[in-house]
Amino acid sequence: MNLIQQLEKEQFDKLSANKTIPEFGPGDTVIVNVKVVEGDRTRVQAYEGVCIGRSGGGINESFTVRKISYGEGVERVFPILSPMIDSIKVVRRGKVRRAKLYYLRQLRGKSARIVEKQDRQQAAVNE
């Protein structure tokens, strides 16, 4: 392990010690609570959408969330360890076969929906 990797690992451990980051991936619907600064006040704003991809690793890891706001597609990229992220919550798991869901940018309406992932144990209980 070279010096840069060692320093990045130390920084990652230090930054992630006080944060709980849930397991999520592309296709999952997430709510990201973001700290917004307005003048001298800060408030928490919820940003809910579909994770269309994760990129990078370690300190540099980020994820992209896409939502439809007033009929217009809005995408936002969040660094995983950003101090502006208050919390991340996974609402539902999506069943996808791609790591990057950029094709959703061209789809509208029902065709842009993602099927919910069913766990094997959960499916066995339901039957």
From Swiss-Prot:
InterPro entries: Ribosomal_bL19, Ribosomal_bL19_CS, Ribosomal_bL19_sf, Translation_prot_SH3-like_sf. The keyword Ribosomal protein applies. The keyword Ribosomal protein applies. Keywords: Ribonucleoprotein, Ribosomal protein. GO terms for cellular component: cytosolic large ribosomal subunit. It comes from the Bacteria. HAMAP family: Ribosomal_bL19 (MF_00402). PANTHER family: LARGE RIBOSOMAL SUBUNIT PROTEIN BL19M (PTHR15680:SF9), RIBOSOMAL PROTEIN L19 (PTHR15680). Belongs to the bacterial ribosomal protein bL19 family. This is Large ribosomal subunit protein bL19. It comes from Bradyrhizobium sp. (strain BTAi1 / ATCC BAA-1182). The lineage of its organism: Bacteria, Pseudomonadati, Pseudomonadota, Alphaproteobacteria, Hyphomicrobiales.
